[in-house]
Amino acid sequence: MNITKATRWRVFAGVWLQSLFTSATAYFSLFCIPLTTKFGWSDSAFALAYTIYMFTYCAVGFIGGSLAEKISPRKTIYIGLCLFAGGWFLTGFASSIPQLYVFYGLMAGAGGGMIYPACLPTALKWFPDRSGSISGLVQAGASCGPFIMSPIAQTLIDRVGAQMTCRILAIVFLIGVGIAAAMIVPCPEGW
């Protein structure tokens, strides 16, 4: 691979895009009313899925970071992506609270927890001269995700229902993060 200054910007773009897509948990509340109404779940039981997601995301972060160092950031992202997109896809079939907790809370949470710590350190290694700015810009990607995707998700929920929307979003995440991961390469020693 020919390493140039453009390479680091390509890596940054991939990291920024993954941040945009994996910030989906920020608009998971859009699914509350349709799913609790359809299945008779309580709001608090539904909300616990988000808590489980965030706990799992944080708990698995160490594993994601360690794997990225051992096998490569890209491979770690792909493993996390399978869990993340798979969890969202299976959430589209969940008809009970335990299924919601396993598919969204544990599976999607574990996937997100593997993706982010594989991405951010990789971007920062490419930009030792701008680590603060790059970190902030990656975080901006996470903020743009809900801003861009919430209206799309709400439109899909209104047109095809919450469960089908979960499945559609899973496919979007699979494609989007898959493309983003292809842009991410480890920083060579001495860069």
Task: Locate each region found by the language model.
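Helix-loop-helix hairpin linking two adjacent transmembrane segments in secondary transporters
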Residues: 141-189
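Pair of pore-lining "gating" transmembrane helices in MFS-fold secondary transporters
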Residues: 7-27
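Membrane-interface helix termini in secondary transporters
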Residues: 34, 65-66, 155
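Hydrophobic core of transmembrane alpha-helices in multi-pass small-molecule transporters
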Residues: 20, 87, 98-114
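Core transmembrane helices of Major Facilitator Superfamily
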Residues: 24, 107-119, 142-144
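Intracellular juxtamembrane helix-capping segments at the cytosolic ends
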Residues: 35, 105, 113-127, 134-135
